[in-house]
């Protein structure tokens, strides 16, 4: 596909000559983005356009967040760590360093921290900056925990309201180019999983990572209901490991 997540910066952010703001909302669904767009379109001051991008696999935060940064080379080190041009991209400071390596006039901040600033402080923060990344985590912080996942739809509604407010504030301080995107979405099922919903992975295959929706390993195998793709094809390198994933609505059986 032409619109790959890992090409986001080079195809969307980099070519802009004007100041550009990117808001990355963790696990913000495509459908939720449509709702946000509809709300913004009701205002005469906003002109919106929605496009898609194809996420890599596994479609999880530790792959998606680094992929949205400027990159020439992405490399999976194992242990849930994806390097960007040989650098870690786990926390805010590391991501800002990567941004500033490509564009020195770059900043990164949590959206909630930005919204807590006064209007004067917000203007001061963005002045002289070319690229600004804001990180937003309302949906994933709720939906990725068993104790709170039942509240994920309320979290989506809260996220839409927070993003709407964020766009409002940015427009007030004369930011014109604003991109709202996500590292991945989510799949939600109301009923409890039983044995018929689960796929047993081969016991004689070693996996570096094994999750409900994906597994990473070096040995290919044939199993009904399981597809795979080479990690190198996802990252654009020569990594020969495989990402395995259910080809239907089922999940992998994990401890």
Task: Report residues per predicted region.
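Feature captures the catalytic ectodomains and active-site-proximal regions of enzymes
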Residues: 1-255
């Amino acid at each position: 596909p032409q619109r790959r997540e890992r090409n986001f910066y080079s195809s969307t952010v980099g070519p802009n000559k004007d100041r550009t703001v990117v808001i990355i909302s963790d696990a913000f669904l495509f459908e939720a983005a449509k709702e946000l767009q509809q709300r913004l379109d009701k205002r005469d001051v906003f002109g919106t356009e929605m496009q898609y991008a194809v996420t890599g696999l596994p479609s999880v935060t530790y792959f998606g967040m680094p992929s949205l940064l400027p990159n020439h080379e992405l490399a999976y080190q194992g242990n849930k760590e994806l390097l960007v041009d040989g650098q870690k991209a786990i926390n805010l400071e590391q991501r800002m360093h990567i941004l500033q390596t490509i564009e020195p006039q770059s900043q990164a901040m949590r959206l909630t921290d930005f919204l807590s600033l006064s209007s004067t402080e917000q203007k001061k923060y963005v002045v002289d900056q070319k690229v600004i990344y804001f990180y937003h985590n309302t949906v994933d912080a709720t939906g990725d925990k068993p104790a709170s996942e039942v509240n994920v739809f309320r979290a989506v509604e809260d996220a839409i309201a927070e993003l709407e407010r964020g766009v409002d504030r940015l427009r007030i301080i004369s930011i014109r180019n604003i991109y709202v995107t996500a590292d991945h979405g989510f799949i939600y099922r109301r009923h409890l999983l039983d044995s018929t919903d689960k796929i047993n992975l081969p016991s004689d295959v070693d996996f570096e990572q094994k999750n409900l929706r994906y597994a990473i390993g070096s040995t290919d195998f044939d199993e009904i209901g399981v597809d795979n793709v080479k990690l190198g094809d996802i990252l654009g390198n020569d990594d020969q490991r495989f990402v395995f994933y259910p080809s239907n609505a089922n999940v992998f059986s994990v401890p």
